[in-house]
């Protein structure tokens, strides 16, 4: 299964909508930057028909070093999760 990169998206959108690659790159970069800024400021991001980027606080917990088996503390942190929306989930499930 191939991986699609940001450059692949820029090239696809540029070709599909007959825009310059630089203009398309600016749109994609600005879109992603808005998502980043929203998450950094503590806001969840909801993209209708696609899914939600949500912030979750994980508490500290004991972990284990896989090489030595020693118990090591894992510090508390905030993580970003993605939860696909119903439409995206349904379309992906059809492709199996």
Curated annotation (Swiss-Prot):
GO biological process annotation, one example: DNA recombination
Molecular function per GO: DNA binding; structural constituent of chromatin
Domain of life per record: Bacteria
Keyword Amino-acid biosynthesis set for record: no
GO cellular component: cytosol
Keywords: DNA recombination, DNA-binding, Transcription, Transcription regulation, Translation regulation
Keyword Transcription in annotation: yes
InterPro entries: Hist_DNA-bd, Histone-like_DNA-bd_CS, IHF-like_DNA-bd_dom_sf, IHF_alpha
Family, as annotated: Belongs to the bacterial histone-like protein family.
Known role: This protein is one of the two subunits of integration host factor, a specific DNA-binding protein that functions in genetic recombination as well as in transcriptional and translational control.
Subunit-structure text: Heterodimer of an alpha and a beta chain.
Protein's name according to its UniProt entry: Integration host factor subunit alpha
Species: Haemophilus influenzae (strain ATCC 51907 / DSM 11121 / KW20 / Rd)
The organism's taxonomic lineage, starting at the top: Bacteria, Pseudomonadati, Pseudomonadota, Gammaproteobacteria, Pasteurellales
């Amino acid at each position: 299964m191939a991986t699609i990169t940001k450059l692949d998206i820029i090239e696809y959108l540029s070709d599909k909508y007959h825009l310059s690659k630089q203009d398309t790159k600016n749109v994609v970069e600005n879109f992603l930057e808005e998502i980043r800024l929203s998450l950094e400021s503590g806001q969840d991001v909801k993209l209708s028909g696609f899914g939600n980027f949500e912030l979750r606080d994980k508490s500290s917990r004991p972990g284990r070093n896989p090489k030595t088996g020693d118990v090591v503390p894992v510090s508390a942190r905030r993580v970003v999760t993605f939860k696909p929306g119903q439409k995206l989930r349904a379309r992906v499930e059809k492709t199996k």
